[in-house]
């Protein structure tokens, strides 16, 4: 056993004394030592209940003959970090999480690991660590929050962000906003729509790193606790059979995950996280692959923010196994990929029935013939830009309008709330990329304000930053190269015409080449916004959003 390095033999008597100091018996020390990575904290609704799942995981490990030992990691709540300096730290926390887990698992030689994440950057950070360490491992996520209820309809956090814009536009009163505030997020779990956290938890299942049900079983369900116990038991089987993350997270598994992502209409943040996880696994996954799979994979689900349904509806409809079976039956995913069940994707999903066809449509009758995400290219984004196509209104699939240029999210949000943005405009938010931000902030507040004001049908927004999975509308992010790296977005001037064609995958600045060359001669990179601390180091080491914003 790997853990023998800290517990077996004469020279390890001091080590055993330390283990005994924590109350471990000889029998417990002799058993396989299983690290339980707990992302619990009291800041994230999606993580507030994780200690209960940790205890269930430990029970499962013990039932299967192992000794569980728990350690923590950090987690940022993107909702609480939104629209202030805290959001600069969100994406950057992903690398910290992976690094911290590496430190703990290398300093203390566990035999296997159980990862317990739930929210936005914690899931990919843990998947990166799992690939890097390549110890037998399994994931059990915290599960989705139930949707709230307001005036007879389902609501969630995205409803709250859009309500801010509705109040500003006079479409909603502050009293109505306060009433909505009390019921939009009814309890624990990752925010209820197909936002980033739930998209990534579904990706855990699609990649094969979580048991069936991991992506959609509600946080408050007894089924989630049972799933945690099963995960604790299953990690012992993975250890016994020596099945490791790199046996599971293969090129085939990543292509399957992208196909599931397209079918779900998931968050654009998968275009950052899946390539970063693949990078750790030694698998090439770029935006061209996303584009290729998008072109052949129909969108068969349309959950909030693109539609009115939430993750609980997807769970009732059959969950990710039903979605994957729908794709598998039509040759859109590869059933031979191995999973943490010890069986293949085909074994796991074959025969899974769709019980609510209004939630999971047939491949023959999809919401759209292509996937829910699209990659755009053009002179504004030669390395690519990303849009949640499934959440764009039909009238905004093609748009041409004058640029309204802002050098920060804060400037843009103030202009939107000040009613300075008019129908037809293209809002440009730059110097918010991985390096320029630094940290590639999410632009949920600006996009939600536009939607709440009713401008999502006439205004587009492009940025070298990124978006929350709760954003909707013609919100085009990850523009690469970013402004701080000298990308063309840095040279856009107020009033320039920008042409967007999402169906054709085009993003163009309509300015003559001679004028662009003149502007480039006069352009100078602005000084870094932050030079010290972790963010300063991050800004110096981070790569393009087109590469997953990994560190080099």
From Swiss-Prot:
SUPFAM superfamilies for this protein: IlvD/EDD N-terminal domain-like, LeuD/IlvD-like
List residues binding Mg(2+): 78, 120-121, 442
Q: Spell out which residues are annotated as carrying N6-carboxylysine.
A: 121
Question: Per its UniProt record, what PROSITE patterns does this chain match?
Answer: ILVD_EDD_1 (PS00886), ILVD_EDD_2 (PS00887)
Matching Pfam families, A to Z? ILV_EDD_C, ILVD_EDD_N
Co-factor note (free text)? Binds 1 [2Fe-2S] cluster per subunit. This cluster acts as a Lewis acid cofactor.
User: Which GO BP terms sit in this record?
Assistant: isoleucine biosynthetic process; L-valine biosynthetic process
Q: Name one GO molecular function term.
A: 2 iron, 2 sulfur cluster binding
The protein's matches in Gene3D superfamilies, at most eight in alphabetical order, are given as: IlvD/EDD C-terminal domain-like (3.50.30.80)
Please give the pathway this protein is involved in: Amino-acid biosynthesis; L-isoleucine biosynthesis; L-isoleucine from 2-oxobutanoate: step 3/4; Amino-acid biosynthesis; L-valine biosynthesis; L-valine from pyruvate: step 3/4
Spell out the reaction equation it catalyses: (2R)-2,3-dihydroxy-3-methylbutanoate = 3-methyl-2-oxobutanoate + H2O; (2R,3R)-2,3-dihydroxy-3-methylpentanoate = (S)-3-methyl-2-oxopentanoate + H2O
**What UniProt keywords apply to this chain's record, in alphabetical order?**
2Fe-2S, Amino-acid biosynthesis, Branched-chain amino acid biosynthesis, Iron, Iron-sulfur, Lyase, Magnesium, Metal-binding
Q: What are the names of the required cofactors?
A: [2Fe-2S] cluster; Mg(2+)
Known partners and oligomeric status: Homodimer.
The entry sums up its family as follows: Belongs to the IlvD/Edd family.
Question: What biological function has been recorded for the protein in this entry?
Answer: Functions in the biosynthesis of branched-chain amino acids. Catalyzes the dehydration of (2R,3R)-2,3-dihydroxy-3-methylpentanoate (2,3-dihydroxy-3-methylvalerate) into 2-oxo-3-methylpentanoate (2-oxo-3-methylvalerate) and of (2R)-2,3-dihydroxy-3-methylbutanoate (2,3-dihydroxyisovalerate) into 2-oxo-3-methylbutanoate (2-oxoisovalerate), the penultimate precursor to L-isoleucine and L-valine, respectively.
Could you identify this protein by its name? Dihydroxy-acid dehydratase
Instruction: Please spell out the taxonomic lineage of the organism that makes this protein.
Output: Bacteria, Bacillati, Bacillota, Clostridia, Moorellales
Q: What gene is behind this protein?
A: ilvD
């Amino acid at each position: 056993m790997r853990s023998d390095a800290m517990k077996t033999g004469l020279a390890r008597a001091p080590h055993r004394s330390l283990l005994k100091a924590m109350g471990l018996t000889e029998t417990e020390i002799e058993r396989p030592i299983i690290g339980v990575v707990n992302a619990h904290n009291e800041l994230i609704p999606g993580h507030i209940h994780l200690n209960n799942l940790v205890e269930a995981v430990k029970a499962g490990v013990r039932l299967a003959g192992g000794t569980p030992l728990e350690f923590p990691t950090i987690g940022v709540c993107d909702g609480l970090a939104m629209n202030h300096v805290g959001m600069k730290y969100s994406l950057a926390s992903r690398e910290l999480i992976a690094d911290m887990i590496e430190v703990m698992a290398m300093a203390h030689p566990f035999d296997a690991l159980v990862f317990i994440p739930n929210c936005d950057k914690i899931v990919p950070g843990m998947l990166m660590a799992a690939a890097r360490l390549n110890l037998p491992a399994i994931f059990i996520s915290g599960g989705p929050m139930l949707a709230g209820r307001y005036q007879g309809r389902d609501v969630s956090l995205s409803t709250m962000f859009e309500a801010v814009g509705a109040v500003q536009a006079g479409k909603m009163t502050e009293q109505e906003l306060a009433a909505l505030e009390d019921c939009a997020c009814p309890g624990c779990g990752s925010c209820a729509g197909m936002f980033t956290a739930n998209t990534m938890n579904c990706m855990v299942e699609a990649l094969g790193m979580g048991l069936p049900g991991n992506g959609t079983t509600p946080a408050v369900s007894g089924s989630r606790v049972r799933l945690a116990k099963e995960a604790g038991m299953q990690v012992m089987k993975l250890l016994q059979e020596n099945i490791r993350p790199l046996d599971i997270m293969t090129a085939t598994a990543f292509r399957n995950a992208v196909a599931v992502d397209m079918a779900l209409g998931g968050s654009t943040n998968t275009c950052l996280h899946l390539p970063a996880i693949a990078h750790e696994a030694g698998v090439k996954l770029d935006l061209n692959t996303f584009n290729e799979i998008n072109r052949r994979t129909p969108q068969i689900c349309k959950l909030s923010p693109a539609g009115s349904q939430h993750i609980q509806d997807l769970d009732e409809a059959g969950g990710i196994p039903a979605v994957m079976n729908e794709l598998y039956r039509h040759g859109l995913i590869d059933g031979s990929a191995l999973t943490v069940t010890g069986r293949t994707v085909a074994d796991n999903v074959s025969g899974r029935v769709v019980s609510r066809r209004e939630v999971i449509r047939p491949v023959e009758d999809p919401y759209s013939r292509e996937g829910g995400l699209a990659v755009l290219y053009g002179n504004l984004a030669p390395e690519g830009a990303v849009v949640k196509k499934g959440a764009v209104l039909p009238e905004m699939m093609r748009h041409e309008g004058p640029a309204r240029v802002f050098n920060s999210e804060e400037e843009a949000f103030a202009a939107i709330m000040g009613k300075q943005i008019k129908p037809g405009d293209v809002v440009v938010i730059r110097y918010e990329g991985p390096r320029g931000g630094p940290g590639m902030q999410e632009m949920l507040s600006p996009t939600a304000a536009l939607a709440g004001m009713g401008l999502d049908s006439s205004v587009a927004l492009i940025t070298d930053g990124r978006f929350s999975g709760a954003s909707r509308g013609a919100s085009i992010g990850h523009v690469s190269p970013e402004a701080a790296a000298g990308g063309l977005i840095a040279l856009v001037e107020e009033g320039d015409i920008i042409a967007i064609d999402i169906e054709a995958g085009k993003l163009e600045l309509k300015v003559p080449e001679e004028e662009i060359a003149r502007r480039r001669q006069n352009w100078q990179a602005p000084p870094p916004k932050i030079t010290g601390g972790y963010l300063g180091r991050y800004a110096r080491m981070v790569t393009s959003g087109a590469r997953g914003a990994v560190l080099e």
